[in-house]
């Protein structure tokens, strides 16, 4: 594995290997000294063209816990805001000796361009590109599911037979796209639920069932319910009548939460719009994995950086 750009092209064995290495990294986080010397002497650049809190901090923590040198680059206040191209930025990073570049970009396909261009000889990790993909978010979601379902015996396990329902703004969600492909690769059955206006045209070609009625989807007794944020910043039109109407029809409120099995899992990639797509009670319930997902993110990103920069030496 030279780059981590997409879950659509990620092989099953590579996905399970990464999740297993993430288990080892999670064990490290349980120690008093949460650090390994694995990437000492390596330089990891976080190249963020979009605002981010969770993902950026998570990648910073992951690289530092592997003893890498970390450079964080924000487009705001940089030469990019003055018109510098992605090519020129990449060549600048190459001159600085970057070994890995974690890139978040508003344009779909930007990380793939960076990886294939020859502008920089570094491992590329996609930290979210437009509405295309967000592979490490899907991996940390799968890691969290696997731990909840299989506990300490999760190493080497897939998600065969697990029913996952993803609800909300599918149209603008790179998280949904990455999850659909990865979960299918790991054997899960995925159902997407959204108003028709928030489903992309190409969704009919995805390996997932499509529904428009959340109550009907919950009646099918899914193992996992993943709620997605309404991405108002990407909307330039009315995709539903009102937020109240959206919440009434597609929000995970207290009454719908009460219908779920006691051992079901409620997920949200964050940030949450409490009271819109998910109630406070659902977000804070014992079924919720929201905080676990944040912790899992560091472990999964440690595993990704380790495998890209040192873990494949044995392969």
From Swiss-Prot:
Protein family: Belongs to the aspartate/ornithine carbamoyltransferase superfamily. ATCase family.
PANTHER family documented for this protein: ASPARTATE CARBAMOYLTRANSFERASE, ORNITHINE CARBAMOYLTRANSFERASE, MITOCHONDRIAL
Keyword field: Pyrimidine biosynthesis, Transferase
Binding sites annotated in the UniProt record for carbamoyl phosphate: 54-55, 104, 134, 137, 270-271
UniProt-recorded name of the protein: Aspartate carbamoyltransferase catalytic subunit
Function: Catalyzes the condensation of carbamoyl phosphate and aspartate to form carbamoyl aspartate and inorganic phosphate, the committed step in the de novo pyrimidine nucleotide biosynthesis pathway.
Pathway given in the UniProt record: Pyrimidine metabolism; UMP biosynthesis via de novo pathway; (S)-dihydroorotate from bicarbonate: step 2/3
GO cellular component, one term: cytosol
Its EC number(s): 2.1.3.2
Matches recorded under NCBIfam families: asp_carb_tr, PRK00856.1
PROSITE patterns (alphabetical): CARBAMOYLTRANSFERASE
Molecular functions per Gene Ontology: amino acid binding; aspartate carbamoyltransferase activity
Tree of life domain: Bacteria
Catalytic reaction equation(s): carbamoyl phosphate + L-aspartate = N-carbamoyl-L-aspartate + phosphate + H(+)
Subunit and interaction comment: Heterododecamer (2C3:3R2) of six catalytic PyrB chains organized as two trimers (C3), and six regulatory PyrI chains organized as three dimers (R2).
Residues annotated to bind L-aspartate: 82, 174, 229
One BP term from GO: amino acid metabolic process
């Amino acid at each position: 594995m030279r780059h981590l750009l997409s879950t659509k092209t990620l092989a099953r064995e590579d996905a399970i290997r990464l999740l297993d290495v993430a288990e080892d990294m999670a064990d490290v986080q349980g120690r008093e000294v949460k650090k390994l010397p694995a990437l000492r002497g390596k330089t990891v650049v976080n190249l963020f063209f979009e605002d981010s809190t969770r993902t950026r901090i998570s990648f910073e923590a992951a690289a530092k816990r592997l003893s890498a040198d970390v450079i964080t680059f924000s487009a705001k206040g940089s030469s990019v805001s003055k018109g510098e191209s992605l090519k020129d930025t990449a060549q600048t990073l190459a001159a600085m000796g970057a070994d890995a570049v974690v890139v978040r970009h508003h344009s779909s396909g930007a990380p793939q361009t960076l990886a294939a261009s020859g502008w920089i000889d570094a491992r590329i990790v996609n930290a979210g590109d437009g509405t295309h993909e967000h592979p490490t978010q899907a991996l940390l979601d799968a890691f969290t599911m696997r731990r909840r379902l299989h506990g300490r015996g999760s190493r080497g396990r897939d998600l065969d037979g697990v029913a996952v329902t993803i609800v909300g703004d599918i149209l603008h969600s790179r998280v949904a796209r990455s999850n659909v492909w990865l979960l299918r690769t790991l054997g899960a059955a995925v159902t997407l639920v959204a108003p028709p206006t928030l489903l992309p045209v190409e969704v009919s070609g995805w390996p997932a069932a499509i529904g428009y009625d959340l109550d009907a989807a919950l009646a099918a007794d899914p193992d996992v319910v993943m709620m997605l944020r309404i991405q108002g910043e990407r909307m330039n039109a009315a995709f539903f009548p009102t937020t109240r109407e959206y919440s009434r029809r597609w929000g995970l409120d207290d009454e719908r939460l009460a219908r779920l099995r006691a051992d079901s899992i409620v997920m949200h990639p964050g940030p949450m719009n409490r009271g819109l797509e998910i109630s406070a009670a659902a977000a804070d319930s014992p079924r919720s994995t929201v905080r676990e997902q944040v912790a899992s993110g560091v472990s999964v990103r440690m595993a990704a950086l380790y495998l890209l920069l040192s873990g494949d030496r044995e392969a």
